[in-house]
Each structure stands twice: as C-alpha cells, then as structure tokens.
Amino acid sequence: MQNEAGEYVDLYIPRKCSTSNRIIHAKDHASIQINLAIVDEQSGRATGETKPYAICGAIRRMGESDDCITRLAKDDGYIPKDF
C-alpha cells in the first residue's frame, strides 16, 4: 500500500476480541484466533468456509475463553441452545 507521498507502507488492521470487543494490540501474545469449520448438515463434510473467533489475552488469563467460545457458537447457531 502507498501513502500520499508515494512511499510503500504496511497496512496494519487490528483485530477485535469477539467477546469483549477490545482491540487486540500487537504485543498481546496471549491472544488466540480459532477458526471453526462450517459443516454441511446433509453430508457431514466441511464446506471450506470458516467462522473466526478472536479471544484476547485478558479473557484467557481469567480462564473464561472456553465459556466465551461456547456462548459465541450458540449465538451463531453452531451449537444447539440447550447444550
């Protein structure tokens, strides 16, 4: 990407935590991104599409990442509501 002066610069797009909507900064080495594969209900095979979930290090430090992933997957309809 080029700026107005014609110099090549890198484009940094920060990620946001899927649970807390905090910006995950570049030095947050405890943050993770999990891609859940979307599965066809008829054949039971992965379609090649994924749904990414990003969890920041603060949520992981509290030990809440597994509950957050489960809640997000329920909200998106990947896990039944009565799970």
Curated annotation (Swiss-Prot):
InterPro entries: Ribosomal_eS21, Ribosomal_eS21_CS, Ribosomal_eS21_sf. GO terms for cellular component: cytosolic small ribosomal subunit; rough endoplasmic reticulum. GO terms for molecular function: structural constituent of ribosome. GO terms for biological process: endonucleolytic cleavage in ITS1 to separate SSU-rRNA from 5.8S rRNA and LSU-rRNA from tricistronic rRNA transcript (SSU-rRNA, 5.8S rRNA, LSU-rRNA); endonucleolytic cleavage to generate mature 3'-end of SSU-rRNA from (SSU-rRNA, 5.8S rRNA, LSU-rRNA); translation. PROSITE patterns: RIBOSOMAL_S21E (PS00996). It is found in: Cytoplasm, Cytosol; Cytoplasm; Rough endoplasmic reticulum. The keyword Cytoplasm applies. Component of the 40S small ribosomal subunit. The gene is RpS21. It holds the Pfam family Ribosomal_S21e. Transmembrane segments: none annotated. Belongs to the eukaryotic ribosomal protein eS21 family. This is Small ribosomal subunit protein eS21. Keywords: Cytoplasm, Endoplasmic reticulum, Ribonucleoprotein, Ribosomal protein.
